[in-house]
Amino acid sequence: MKIAAFSRFALIVVFGLSLAGCSTSMSDLLGGGPDTGTSGSADSTASSGELKRGTGLNLGFGQAEESEPVAKLYNKALEDLQKGYYRTAAKGFDEVERQHPYSQWATRAILMAAYSQYMRNGYDDAINAAERFITLHPGHKDTPYAYYLIAISYYEQIMDIKRDQSVTEKALTALDEISVRFPNTAYAQDAANKAILARDHLAGKEMEVGRYYLKENSLLAAINRFKTVVIKYQTTTHTPEALYRLTETYYALGVMNEAQTAAAVLGANYPSSDWYKDAYSLLKTGGLEPVENKDSWISKAWKAVTPG
């Protein structure tokens, strides 16, 4: 089960599948005209508002001029893409590059092939093609989109937290890279939003495993999982429960100062949470109160992320 039900729509909006053309400065992107080389900046990307309206980064589905040798191959691949024959389209764009490697359309064909692979759910092939585009054309004006396509291809593959989450980690790495490489762009904004969900998913996996260990009375193993959430995924929705579980587990082990610290940090940051109410009640059964030990790893980990 994927967590990104709307991500395909988002990518289509970014890639601009309208046939009506594009009124933005990016009308030549991929489909509006032949390759013109580098842009020197990713700042020409559309605003997030444009992405939501579907008017930014419009493909335009520009065809190659019939007088060009590449025209027949490229335009046939483009036609297949428009009709939804994505596998055939990908092969057609690959053939454009193979037969006309020095054509101004060959560069664009690589990314069009990557997009076609993505649309047929061929995520690994889409990633490989986009990575190849980046390797061959690192300074191209469309390189930011190639990075975005890679990230979304990983993101689409995120599975239920009961499954292996290695692809989620790859998605998060790719999404974070976009934010670092292309800040202040619509790509970065969307990547940041998706990264929040990816981190929450990884935290959910840690909690799932931690609860299992707790149920099996493997308390130290459970603590390590909850500890990971507090240290690595502190800003996710799973943190209140992780702090409660630490209270519960340390209490069961008789490590009361850590149990009290976990409850105190929980109460200070989520005072209205049901998890805090449960933690407080648990401590009261032993005649204890939430008290933060500043030397506790919990206190130090929290201060490292939220100082002050």
Model-inferred region functions:
Residues 2-6, 13, 21-308:
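Acidic, polar-rich low-complexity tracts and alpha-helical solenoid repeat scaffolds
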